[in-house]
Amino acid sequence: MEAQLLFSEKQKFTQWWIWGIILLINSIWIVAIFVQLIGGTPFGNNPMSDVGIIITAILTILLSVFMRSIRLDTQIRSDGIYVKFFPFYLKFKKYFWYEISACYLREYKPIKEYGGWGIRGFLKNRALNVSGNQGLQLIFTDNKKLLIGTNKPDEMKQTLMNLGKLTE
């Protein structure tokens, strides 16, 4: 029998500056295609081959598609916390309540504490985040830590309080 779903959140990279950089990079290679391949004028002082431009343009577009596909799914269920960071985790990682010694929401500094967003940190102190500065801090019975970013801290806090699992 599947545990009851009490809270669910899906997050994607939506920061304007990330998409601005990706758009700028893609634009450069689209311009290169038009200038060199269609216009016949070499692009730049030391132009890349036509095949090189096509391959690079395809790779930058694939990077854009990949960035768009990244998604952090968080679920709070009656038996624990489930997290999937697609496409890195294809299935939910399950953290059962009996494995968690502390569970609380906190404000954090993504760049200072973890070096940015994504799958961050090392073995004993990890973070899964895509935006913002609010997160669910889990401390496990083996003293390892996991911070899961959230854009719904109030709703998450209420769910954890209703379950009696909020520790701080």
Regions found by a protein language model. Give the residues of each.
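A membrane-cytosol interface segment of integral membrane proteins
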Residues: 2-3, 7, 122-168
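Single-pass alpha-helical transmembrane signal-anchor segments
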Residues: 53-68
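Hydrophobic alpha-helical transmembrane segments
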Residues: 44-56
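N-terminal membrane-targeting/pre-transmembrane regions
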Residues: 1-47, 127, 155
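Transmembrane-cytosolic junction motif
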Residues: 64-79, 90
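Non-transmembrane, membrane-adjacent beta-strand/coil modules in membrane-associated proteins
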Residues: 13, 83-144
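Juxtamembrane/interfacial segments around transmembrane helices
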Residues: 48, 72-74, 78, 101-112, ...
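A short, polar/proline- and glycine-enriched secondary-structure boundary/capping micro-motif
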Residues: 16-19, 92-95, 149, 157-161
